[in-house]
From Swiss-Prot:
The protein's name in its UniProt record: Large ribosomal subunit protein uL4
Assembly and oligomerization: Part of the 50S ribosomal subunit.
GO cellular component: ribonucleoprotein complex; ribosome
Highest classification ranks of the organism: Bacteria, Pseudomonadati, Pseudomonadota, Alphaproteobacteria, Rickettsiales
UniProt cross-references to SUPFAM superfamilies, sorted A to Z: Ribosomal protein L4
Organism: Rickettsia prowazekii (strain Madrid E)
Protein family (similarity comment): Belongs to the universal ribosomal protein uL4 family.
Length: 207
């Protein structure tokens, strides 16, 4: 399956053969894409939320007043959950939110996400993801030729430092090395730009 290779100026500079089993799956499985995104987002959660229980709250263990004769409801501790400044009952605890997902499904998610972008003609192969200067204005001018609102750029083994610095001030533009290709960022950005090195890596990784 042949497709165009473009320059950053959106000019055709050649052709590349893509593996249709990775970049052009016939039936897009949105359910698999959603499963992988849920897995990614759950894994990214810190899970460091925590409230103190009765046994962890600082304070005295002395009974606040005698059991009988005050007219008040009986109380055993100032740290009880019903007291101001007391412990929290059934509050959140530090835990991992990560869920298990088979590696095969994670691979399929990436394949179907790439295929979806290709079907929408929003997956583009770029001949070179390098800039002479780390100037945001230069990159904004180049990306404007693609008429997109957001870009997920997947470079080769190493990201060009000038390109990376130039993206810092551009809203909704992200560049990652080839190992950083992921379903969530592919789906949430309008355009996906791949270097030729990234294409080779993904075909090797997902075959």
């Amino acid at each position: 399956m042949k497709t165009k290779i473009l320059s950053l100026a959106n000019e055709e500079v050649g052709e590349i053969t893509l593996n249709k089993d990775i970049f052009a799956v016939e039936f897009i499985r949105d359910d698999i894409i959603k499963q992988v995104i849920d897995w990614q987002r759950a894994k990214a959660m810190f899970g460091n939320h925590k409230t103190k229980t009765v046994s962890e709250v600082s304070g005295t263990t002395k009974k606040p007043f005698k059991q009988k004769g005050t007219g008040n409801a009986r109380q055993g501790s100032l740290r009880s959950v019903q007291m101001r400044g007391g412990g929290i009952s059934h509050g959140p605890k530090v835990r991992s939110h990560a869920i298990k997902l088979p590696k095969k499904v994670r691979k399929l998610g990436l394949i179907h996400a790439l295929s979806e972008k290709y079907a929408e003609e929003k997956l583009l192969i770029i001949d070179s993801l390098k800039l002479d200067k780390p100037k945001t204005s230069i990159l904004v001018n180049l990306l404007s030729k693609f008429q997109g609102q957001s870009f997920f750029v997947i470079d080769g083994n190493k990201v060009d430092i000038n390109f990376s610095l130039a993206t810092k001030n551009i809203y909704n533009t992200l560049i990652v090395p080839q190992i950083g290709a992921n379903v969530y960022d592919i789906i949430r950005h309008e355009y996906v730009l791949l270097s030729q090195e990234a294409v080779s890596f993904l075909e090797e990784r997902l075959r």
